[in-house]
């Protein structure tokens, strides 16, 4: 029986990069992984509907600074309008610093690392798999028929000219007694092409009939490798 590899892990180092980028000694590694997980959970808990796409975390070699880059489609919910950007960003940074210090003290680690925040705006949100998945979760939890929700998502994807998308919904669809899976696709979604910029997301919708699983793949285009010219010495 064939197995399906995770689309993002399959492309690490080609079109995808690691969400956490740092080096650590073996005895420090587990603590830093826990800190990264804590920061992600804290930000997603504080801003559940702010359109956060990705969180990239980098650390300096001497562990004095933690740099967190937040990619979001709705930066106004995170840092406010233009005049309030600096103040709200500083306030959010200070609050994260306090929570991180508490977490480190709880685990018996001295709170030395300072938090630095950067917010990046994502322009074409319809090509992001997490945006489509969360929209579908919202529709299905409001008891909208899954076919109508899928058609609505499909019209948005086609309107914004996304190159390709595939959506799969599994579970007791529309309250049926027997669970099943249904999917739709538009455009191209080349899952076996490494240079293809494919995004993927999995979410769960909690309905009165049970949990529905939602998987979304989006294709943003092919990233062609840059070929460097090689100088050949002339004899």
Swiss-Prot record:
A Pfam entry, by short name: KH_2
Gene Ontology BP annotations: translation
Source organism of this protein record: Oltmannsiellopsis viridis (Marine flagellate)
Primary residence: plastid
GO cellular component terms given for this protein: chloroplast; cytosolic small ribosomal subunit
Gene: rps3
Ranges where the KH type-2 domain occurs: 39-123
Record-stated family: Belongs to the universal ribosomal protein uS3 family.
InterPro entries: KH_dom-like_a/b, KH_dom_type_2, KH_sf_prok-type, Ribosomal_S3_C_sf, Ribosomal_uS3_bac-typ, Ribosomal_uS3_C, Ribosomal_uS3_CS
Record's protein name: Small ribosomal subunit protein uS3c
PROSITE patterns cross-referenced by the UniProt entry: KH_TYPE_2 (PS50823), RIBOSOMAL_S3 (PS00548)
Alphabetical UniProt keywords: Chloroplast, Plastid, Ribonucleoprotein, Ribosomal protein, RNA-binding, rRNA-binding
